[in-house]
A protein has these predicted regions:
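Membrane-proximal alpha-helical signals and transmembrane carboxylates
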Residues: 7-302
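Short, Lys/Arg-enriched N-terminal segments with co-localized hydrophobic residues
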Residues: 1-5
Length: 302
């Protein structure tokens, strides 16, 4: 009888042990992950790449101790930066995107997690080479990045672009970026479907060309005023506004295959959306006044 009782207890323990361990593991995985919200890719000397990430701070003490001046033959990491409460900025330089991300994970020490990624910012210098497609595919396939992360090209240093990026209106940075891109896409001043999976598919397609969002910083000290132009018939960095956010998103970076070949202003993107039937609004200027008209996009059969 005692043996039977012991067997029953042992079976119960074996049944519940995986559940207990599973619950503990989930918490440990979250605690040990470096959740990246924004990522930047810049060209570095000697054919290297510099990857800069803005991530949730998590355990700042362990991150700082791991990232302080760590170096290896495969590349190097720079010191951890805390640009705002709740977020940290880390960067690593290596011969490839994968090595740089691996270096960040090894020295933080936390596993790089791109499931919450909202934007990938690529410097224009790098975007005008053939490296863009392979970088995006590595991020998407190997690190399983969020399919909906928006691809952005900037003429600025991409790392500095995400360093100065901050959420406003009390929103989390991830939510702020999500709302920001939705708003501009509804205004038809950025290309439709500029997300990671769509941009990769367009770059690999023989029938369509890819388009990413074009963005730049504006210090508001030297605004270029273009006579006879509407507010959206410009490129970012020269928009006539006084918003607190230093980064401006307007227009598109156009690609032929994996290589960036040109840009469109916000107004040109709006016209493109109108001609392709993807426009939701149209901004018209009459006697200097702007009028926004919502277009009927639903096709009716007769």
């Amino acid at each position: 009888g005692d043996d039977d009782a012991l067997k029953k207890i042992a079976l119960m323990l074996l049944t519940f042990l995986p559940l207990l361990l599973g619950g503990c593991t989930g918490g440990q995985e979250i605690e040990s992950s470096l959740f990246v919200i924004a990522m930047a890719v810049d060209a570095a000397p000697e054919g290297n790449l510099t990857i800069t990430v803005k991530a949730l701070s998590g355990s700042q003490e362990s991150a700082a101790s791991g990232a302080s001046g760590a170096q290896s033959e495969a590349g190097s990491t720079e010191n951890l930066e805390q640009t705002e409460t709740g977020y940290i900025v880390l960067s690593a330089t290596a011969p490839s995107c994968l090595r740089a991300l691996g270096l960040l994970g090894a020295t933080t020490p936390r596993t790089v997690n791109l499931s919450q990624l909202q934007e990938i910012v690529i410097s224009q210098t790098l975007a005008e080479t053939d490296a863009t497609l392979s970088i995006l595919k590595q991020i998407h396939a190997i690190y399983r990045a969020n399919d909906e992360a928006v691809v952005v090209v900037t003429p600025d240093h991409a790392g500095d672009f995400i360093r100065r990026q901050r959420a406003v209106l009390g929103l989390r940075l991830s939510k702020y970026l999500e709302v920001l891109f939705e708003h501009y896409e509804q205004l038809d001043v950025i290309p439709p479907s500029p997300n990671l999976s769509a941009v990769i598919a367009a770059m690999e397609s023989a029938a369509t060309d890819a388009a990413a969002v074009y963005a730049a910083g504006n210090d508001f000290d030297n605004i270029l005023l273009l006579q006879g132009k509407t507010d959206i018939d410009r490129l970012p960095g020269h928009l006539p506004r006084t918003a607190p956010a230093p980064n401006e998103y307007m227009g598109a970076a156009l690609f032929s295959g994996p290589r960036m070949t040109g840009t469109l202003t916000g107004n040109e993107v709006s016209l493109f959306c109108l001609m392709t039937g993807k426009a939701s609004t149209r901004v018209s200027v009459i006697d200097g006044a702007q009028y926004k008209t919502r277009l009927q996009t639903r096709v009716k059969r007769r």
